[in-house]
């Protein structure tokens, strides 16, 4: 399959649009089990997975995302995993004194070069911040096969901030508020964050930390709707190199991918939907078309409401002009055109202009009266 720009460098424009909406990402480690879970919430149904093979210089990896093939999440051959949350833009100090970064997104460099969270943090701070994206509108969560994890975001001071998972058994969660600066948020407090934490707290030992339990967390925080929908979910078993994929918040069918086997295939990409049964795809399509139909109806209703408002505004304007407003026909035609284009907002502009004329006329009349009295 041809994957377009899959193996090219990432532009600033692509990077600024790369991180989708209300994703919920979490990782946990207990004993010898380390898992990483993600719900990809967005509007683009064209989802893919693809493979970067290993080389003498780079680790191979399996990645997930959309048809622009910007990395949204993934796992490399060493078990290092990542995903990202969208945030409002934040300031990031450029550090021009540092070496120039590679001509790719910093996370892609990390996934090629790092095996652990410690190595990822070292790479993150090594270069100028050019390849983080301008403006900086996201945070990333990274976890490795040892159980270490970190959320990297912009701190209040404009420096990279590293929110670490506690050492040993435990968990780390990332949604759409900045873990180092909660004021930088799309939603805070975040119900998805609170729900995920509530469920992760119930894990007491390694026997509780299972793929099925992670799946239940993903299900409990998934989204449905025309504006933001859980398009796919993934669970990475980092110790065993296994990917569990779910399509369109349907958690009753799972596809398992072996990371090592996928990397051996070389450069490769495939639609996520093509991995699943016709029944699962039919359900997803029916839901998608249902949302699209509702959006079309809503747009039509909005168009009718707007036309009614424009017509009403035009009637009010013509009535006012006919009452004897002292303006030329040319000015009247201009106001008619303004109201046709801008509806009630144009009418509001007319009234503001009319009031201004009245005030000017009253002021001139007062001055004339004062002059006559002298």
Language-model regions: role of each:
Residues 325, 349-374:
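Membrane-interface alpha-helices
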Residues 301-319:
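Selective detector of the "anchor" transmembrane alpha-helix that sits immediately C-terminal
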Residues 14-22, 26-112, 136, 143-290:
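C-terminal, well-structured catalytic/ligand-binding subdomain of enzymes
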Residues 1-7:
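Bacterial N-terminal signal peptides
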Residues 318-338, 362-363:
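Amphipathic, cytosolic membrane-interfacial segments at TM-TM junctions
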Residues 104-122, 126-132:
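Intrinsically disordered, low-complexity linker/loop segments enriched in Gly/Pro
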Residues 333-356:
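Hydrophobic, aromatic-rich membrane-embedded alpha-helical segments
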Residues 291-305:
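Individual transmembrane alpha-helix segments
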């Amino acid at each position: 399959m041809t994957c377009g720009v899959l193996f090219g460098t990432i532009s600033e424009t692509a990077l600024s649009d790369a991180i989708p909406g209300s994703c919920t990402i979490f990782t946990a480690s207990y004993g010898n089990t380390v898992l990483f879970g993600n719900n990809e919430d967005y509007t683009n149904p064209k989802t893919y997975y693809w493979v970067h093979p290993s080389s003498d210089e780079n680790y191979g990896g399996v990645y997930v995302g959309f048809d622009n093939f910007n990395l949204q999440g993934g796992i490399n051959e060493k078990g290092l995993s990542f995903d990202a949350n969208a945030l409002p833009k934040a300031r990031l100090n450029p550090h021009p004194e540092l070496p120039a970064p590679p001509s790719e997104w910093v996370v892609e460099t990390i996934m090629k070069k790092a095996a652990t969270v410690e190595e990822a943090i070292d790479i993150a701070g090594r270069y100028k911040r050019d390849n983080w994206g301008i403006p900086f509108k996201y945070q990333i969560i990274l976890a490795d096969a040892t159980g270490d994890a970190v959320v990297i975001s912009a701190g209040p001071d404009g420096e990279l901030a590293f929110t670490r998972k506690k050492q040993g058994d435990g968990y780390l969660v990332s949604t759409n508020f900045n873990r180092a600066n909660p004021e930088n948020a799309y939603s805070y407090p975040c119900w998805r964050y609170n729900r995920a934490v509530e469920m992760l707290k119930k894990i007491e030992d390694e026997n509780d930390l299972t793929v099925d339990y992670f799946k239940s967390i993903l299900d409990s925080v998934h989204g449905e709707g025309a504006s933001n929908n859980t398009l796919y979910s993934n669970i990475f078993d980092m110790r065993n190199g296994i990917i569990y994929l779910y399509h369109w918040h349907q958690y009753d069918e799972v596809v398992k991918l072996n990371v090592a086997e996928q990397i051996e295939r070389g450069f490769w990409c495939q639609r996520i939907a093509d991995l699943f049964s016709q029944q699962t795809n039919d359900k997803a399509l029916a839901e998608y078309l249902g949302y699209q139909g509702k959006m079309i109806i809503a747009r039509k209703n909005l168009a009718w409401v707007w036309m009614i408002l424009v017509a009403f505004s035009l009637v009010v304007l013509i009535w006012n002009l006919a009452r004897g407003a002292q303006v030329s026909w040319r000015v009247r035609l201009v106001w008619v055109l303004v109201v046709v284009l801008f509806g009630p907002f144009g009418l509001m502009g007319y009234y503001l202009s009319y009031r201004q004329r009245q005030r000017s006329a009253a002021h001139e009349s007062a001055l004339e009266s004062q002059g006559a009295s002298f």
